[in-house]
UniProtKB/Swiss-Prot annotation:
Enzyme Commission number(s) of this protein: 5.2.1.8
Domain PPIase cyclophilin-type span(s) in chain numbering: 14-195
Leader sequence residues: none
Protein's recorded name: Putative peptidyl-prolyl cis-trans isomerase
Cited Pfam families: Pro_isomerase
Gene Ontology molecular function, alphabetical: peptidyl-prolyl cis-trans isomerase activity
Similarity remark: Belongs to the cyclophilin-type PPIase family.
This protein's record includes keyword Isomerase: yes
Keywords linked to the UniProt accession: Isomerase, Rotamase
Catalytic activity: [protein]-peptidylproline (omega=180) = [protein]-peptidylproline (omega=0)
SUPFAM superfamilies: Cyclophilin-like
Length: 197
């Protein structure tokens, strides 16, 4: 199972634990610097510097994902710590399972500060068989079957962490009433992110 760190809720050596405090409750994640070093460094540095403090989840689509990390709350903003967009860090060890922490982008190698948390609870049966045929590892296909997720985003968005506590908060946020462009009618705010290394 060591190959697929998302399948283990314990924080392993080399992983980083972060707690995201929101006005809807807390979510705890473990991050994977061995899998996505630049992405994790970007997120952790932003978290420590307070970059994400006060930023909202500007796009919420129930049974798909919640997206945040944009200081402009438009979906168009946000910068990386590297001064520009940075490259994708795809891996055959991390997948867009339910609860995955993944980078939002506008195409290949356009990562900035925006991220999303996967919240799709069920993968259709016909898609699961396509995953098997497509060469996805069996433990991951099984996890998609048990937990849900968005496998069509694999190898398109960098997965750099996984929720390990606070799924009820994730669900509460996902069930927020939204208006145009999937923006919550009442702000869902990231108050702070604590990094426990």
């Amino acid at each position: 199972m060591a190959n697929y760190p998302q399948l283990n809720k314990e924080v392993q050596q080399g992983e980083i634990k972060v707690v995201m405090h929101t006005n809807k409750g807390d979510m705890t994640f473990k991050l994977f610097p061995n899998i996505a070093p630049k992405t994790v460094e970007n997120f952790v540095t932003h978290a420590k510097n307070g970059y994400y403090d006060g930023i909202t989840f500007h796009r919420v689509i129930n049974d798909f994902m919640i997206q945040g990390g944009d200081p402009t709350a438009t979906g168009m903003g946000g910068e990386s710590i590297y001064g520009g967009a940075f490259e994708d860090e795809f891996s055959l060890n991390a997948f867009n399972l339910y609860g995955a922490l993944s980078m939002a982008n506008s195409g290949p190698n356009t990562n900035g500060s925006q991220f999303f948390i996967v919240q799709m609870k069920e993968v259709p049966q016909n898609m699961l068989s396509q995953l098997t045929d497509g060469g996805w590892p069996q433990p991951i296909v099984d996890a998609y079957g048990e937990k849900g997720g968005t496998p069509w985003l694999d190898q398109k968005h960098t997965v750099f962490g996984q929720i390990i506590d606070g799924e009820t908060t994730l669900e509460d946020i996902a069930n927020t009433k939204v208006g145009p462009q999937d923006k919550p009618l009442h702000d869902v705010v990231i108050e702070s992110i604590d990094v426990e290394e």
